[in-house]
Amino acid sequence: RYAYGKEKHFDDIYPHIEILFSRHGPDSVSSFAMTCLTYIGDQLGITTKTRWSLGYSKENKGQERLIDICKSEKADMYINAIGGKELYNPDDFYLEGIELRFIKRADNENDLSIIDILMRRGWEETSELVKQYELVE
């Protein structure tokens, strides 16, 4: 509350943040993250289906596990945040028939959290902002 109290859209966004924290029990960080992702996505009109990776084989780790998940979903492209560019080898994905791309936001505010952006820009502007991106290799 103190960090965002002076932001332009605080009065509109903060009640939603309170809802997220009040609805969620102490079961796990990943469960809370999924709750937040779904709730904020709904508010922004994002209809992408999300799934837990728990149901997939845990035989591999890291990049190999992502490739396994992509293959089991018959995905021909994997998109990651641009901050992960140094983590993955595009050639390894390519050899499995999967394009590896990174999402580069048009606003160049890659260091800000979604809460930072919502507090500064509000739901409507953020909804438009998330549509402005470039997929890079």
Language-model features, listed with the residues they occupy:
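Residues lining hydrophobic/aromatic ligand-binding pockets adjacent to catalytic sites
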Residues: R1-E137
